[in-house]
Amino acid sequence: MQNPNVKYLKTPQGDIAVFSLEHNRLWCRRQTSDGRYTPFCIAEGVSAFSLCQYESYTYLLYPTTDGRLILSASSDLMQWEPRPLWHAGDKRWQNTYCFMAPQKDAFHLFYGVSQPQSGNHILEYALFQKGQWQPPYQIDHFLPLPGAPFLGRRLGENHVILYYRSHRSTISAREILLSPFTLGSLSPLIQTGGTCTDFSILEDNQQMHILYLSRNLFRNQVVYRCKQGSAVGRPFVLWESGSACDHCLVYRQQDKIILFWCANSLPMRCICENGTSIGPVERCTFPFPLQSLKGEFIGASDPFASEAIGDRQNNFHPAIFSENTQPLSQPQLYAASAPSQVREEKNDELEELRTLLSQRSEEISAVNAKWKAQVDALQERLAAYEKSEPIENDTP
């Protein structure tokens, strides 16, 4: 899942700036002409942050440890103009994850609210306009995701989309028009019988490419789906393994859609064309971080990715993906030989459950037999004891 404390911004000049929150300090690292990243501390006492670009400005929104909510803007990533949207003393913003969508005359804010009494989480919307906040609007109940509790993307000047977990095993999308505020219907995208441990979504022209990781009883799966219009295509299982999978990522490279993930810390990929034709699994041979993370990627006018992989050991520098790959020598041991339908996946799960149930039944039968033997032995000893005990004579 996305790490909410690291984000990547593609600048108009074409380089990538890295924003990170470390020990309540908000840092920006921008690449210099010699390829190094120069750190610059933007603010201290920060508990969380959000990042976006609008027109010629970059915006940072961050709650502080004393309860303030600050909106800061910059045109060069060096000189920042902080502006308080909420003054000190309100604890609601501490550690609150937000998604923002600024406009010329309004500021739109989406955030999660926890209700300690009930344990519920609510996705809310608030509008800041003409110097004051409008009453918040409750969008939906949701279950926070690991890392970033929910994800938000801007699809246009007046159009955003939210991704969040609407049920225990369902990741859904909801499109929203900002002005006038119009809430779209909920659209389930990912539904798994196991646990969805990570997902990545790329909106590309009229298609939505969905890649996710599913963990079941004894294996991990990498699954791809394509949404075109309102129809979500069938799931394709790209990879199955008993080892751990993480950091799935969808990105566009020229006219190809790349489906990327790590299996047992090894980078893998498939090439997808038109959302239907999927090539073989290949192992990536380019240098890849030993300790990696995934962060939000923002700012490309022609978005080729919505996330990026960074290096924990090298100040979160973005990993550079190249075309260096090699086919797996024995793909049948790891990857699915062909895209399998979700029915096959369910049948495998049922077979595993039947096997597990049979094993447990045998264990229970063995325990029952052991206890029955012990009970029979005790009953025999009790009967023998009663026979050997003399009967008292009540006659005077």
Where are these regions (language model features)?
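Extracellular, repeat-based ectodomains that mediate carbohydrate processing or recognition
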Residues: 1-396
